[in-house]
Regions:
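PLP-dependent amino-acid enzyme catalytic core
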Residues: 1-128
């Protein structure tokens, strides 16, 4: 399949959780992964694109405004989109643990993906 056809297919289809393999599997052609990269996924990314008709109507002129509802990602955050790659590459590099400074979404995502990878996770909570 040509590059343009594959790109068009990716952006014109709506994935469902039943047949979705996660972001890395879907976009690996354009990502820094190889056959040696362990794909650590929680099936992130198959979130709905929703039209916000009230805003579209206010703008007018046939403009349609859409939002991505990333609250439906595995840990409830868009952070899962990047964490799948971060933990996959850390695992590939031989890391046994990950660490982050966070009070919220990053730490939840890092802990979930590290657990899936069989890695330890450490969260540093900033003072204040």
């Amino acid at each position: 399949m040509s590059f343009s056809k594959k790109l068009k297919q990716l952006f014109t289809s709506t994935p469902s959780q039943n047949n979705w393999d996660g972001l890395i599997e879907t976009y690996k052609t354009w990502l820094p992964v190889s056959n040696k990269t362990p794909i650590i996924t929680l099936k992130e990314g198959a979130t709905p694109l929703l039209e916000v008709k009230s805003i579209s109507n206010r703008i007018g002129n046939g403009v349609k405004v859409f939002v991505k509802y990333d609250g439906l990602n595995p840990t409830g955050s868009f952070k899962d989109r990047g964490m799948t790659m971060a933990i996959s590459k850390a695992k590939e590099a031989g890391c046994e643990a990950v660490i982050c400074a966070s009070t919220g979404n990053t730490s939840a995502s890092a802990a979930a993906y590290a657990s899936k990878a069989g890695m330890k996770s450490f969260v540093i909570i900033p003072d204040g």
